[in-house]
Every structure is written in structure tokens, then in C-alpha cells.
Swiss-Prot record:
Gene that this sequence comes from: ndk
Keyword set includes Zinc: no
Annotated keywords: ATP-binding, Cytoplasm, Kinase, Magnesium, Metal-binding, Nucleotide metabolism, Nucleotide-binding, Phosphoprotein, Transferase
Organism, scientific name: Anaeromyxobacter sp. (strain Fw109-5)
Cofactors: Mg(2+)
Catalytic activity annotation: a 2'-deoxyribonucleoside 5'-diphosphate + ATP = a 2'-deoxyribonucleoside 5'-triphosphate + ADP; a ribonucleoside 5'-diphosphate + ATP = a ribonucleoside 5'-triphosphate + ADP
Description of how the protein assembles with itself and partners: Homotetramer.
Binding site for ATP: 11, 59, 87, 93, 104, 114
Active-site residues, record numbering mapped to chain: 117 (pros-phosphohistidine intermediate)
Protein name per its UniProtKB record: Nucleoside diphosphate kinase
SMART domains: NDK
Localisation: Cytoplasm
Amino acid sequence: MANERTLSIIKPDGVEKGVIGQVIARFEKAGLKPIAMKMTHLSQAEAEGFYAVHKARPFFNDLVKFMTSGPVVLMVLEGEGAVAKNREIMGATDPAKAAAGTIRKDFASNIEKNTVHGSDSAENAKIEVSYFFPETAIHTYEWKKA
């Protein structure tokens, strides 16, 4: 499996619950290296642009409202099979259906406030990463085992 990058977002509910460090620790434990990270409060335009693929869906306005309701943590994660690994760690979109030990099972309230976002494909990961991070803001490095 190839080394790849994926976008991860700790959503406003995850920030509000104070689980940022726990979420990042789970990624690192699974071999996903944060190579870019920032906390920001998305504007309506940023959220609408990012989720434009869902514009015709009935949940679009609620999603944008939620994603602009508080700060988020944006991250680029790098590692072998990063997209699939991130999705496995996050768990099912609906926390009620998520496996035990996943981020959503452990921290999410419901399908709307499900704590994290992760790219769903390598192709979308490239688009999503570039939406929030110019290449100059991404810093790859080698892990030295402790």
C-alpha cells in the first residue's frame, strides 16, 4: 500500500468536548503523521465551498451551519494507506453504527455532530487538502521511534 495523504477535520463538537489531543493521538498511534495542522473558524463561504458536492442534499444548510458554529482543527495526515486507515479510525458516519473503539463511537453525539471528517478517496483527499493547505504549509518529516 502506498504512502498517501488525507484531510482530517476535528469538527466543532470535537473541539468543544476537548478531545483534540485524544483524536490526534489515535491517528499517530495508527501510524498517521500530522504534516500540516491549524485551528480556524470556517466562514460560511469556506464551508459552502468545501461541502459544495452536497449542495443539493437536504442536510446541506444544517451541515454548513454546524461547521461554522465553532472552531475546527484541520489536519493533513500522511502514512501508508492514509485514506482507508483514517476512515477506519473514525468509524461509521453514524456513531450508533460505529465500531467500538472508533473516534465516532467514543466521542460523537449523533450523525450530525459526529466529531470528525475524513477524505473518502485518494482523489478527493488531494482536492480537500489543497482547499485548506497550500503545498508550502505541508511539512513532511521522518519519525524517529522513541
